[in-house]
Amino acid sequence: MRPDERQPFKERWLGRYIAYDIESFFVAITEVSTVAGYLAGCLDNPAHNPRFADNGYYASFAPLCDPYPCHLHINLDERYRNRGIGSALIAAFAAQAASAGRSGIHVVTGERARNVRFYEKNEFRPLATARWNGADVVFMGRSLRPRRRSVISTERT
């Protein structure tokens, strides 16, 4: 990333979350007090929130934002990837969203981005794609509703 791109990037992916959703901002700190990564989350539906109007893909994904209203941006220092830290950050945000009564969480990422596999591992499912800024993006949702389990009786009468 070029130096002139850093400030707009920070504002887009961090600034508005810190300013309005600090209670949904999670930081992973290592045993030597180094920041390993963060998750910036929002419990509100971005399709109905003017703060996220610059993310034009929400026009395409608006119907999906109702069952999956909470959204997040996550970033880990590559030295700390593949250690379960990102999954722990997502679990913390999912627990917060569930306790707030929300039905689901989502992310939007590049359709062929390497993080798609990470999200799938964390129970997100690809639900729709759209073209945005010359790239294909995918809306991935994770339900926070309790799963129904089938109960099969093995008793004989």
Language-model-derived ranges and their functions:
Residues 73-76, 82-98, 120-121:
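Conserved acetyl-CoA-binding loop-helix of GNAT-fold acetyltransferases
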Residues 31-37, 114:
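Glycine-rich acetyl-CoA-binding "A-motif" of GNAT/NAT acetyltransferases
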Residues 68-70, 74, 96-111:
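Conserved GNAT acetyl-CoA-binding A-motif
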Residues 57, 109-116, 120-122, 129-156:
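C-terminal "cap" of GNAT-fold acetyltransferases
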Residues 2-31, 40:
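Active-site rim helix/loop that mediates acceptor-substrate recognition in acyltransferases
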Residues 23-27, 38, 73, 137-139:
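Short hydrophobic/aromatic beta-strand element in the GNAT-like acyltransferase core
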Residues 40-74:
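Conserved acyl-donor/pantetheine-binding loop and adjacent beta-alpha core of acyl/acetyltransferases
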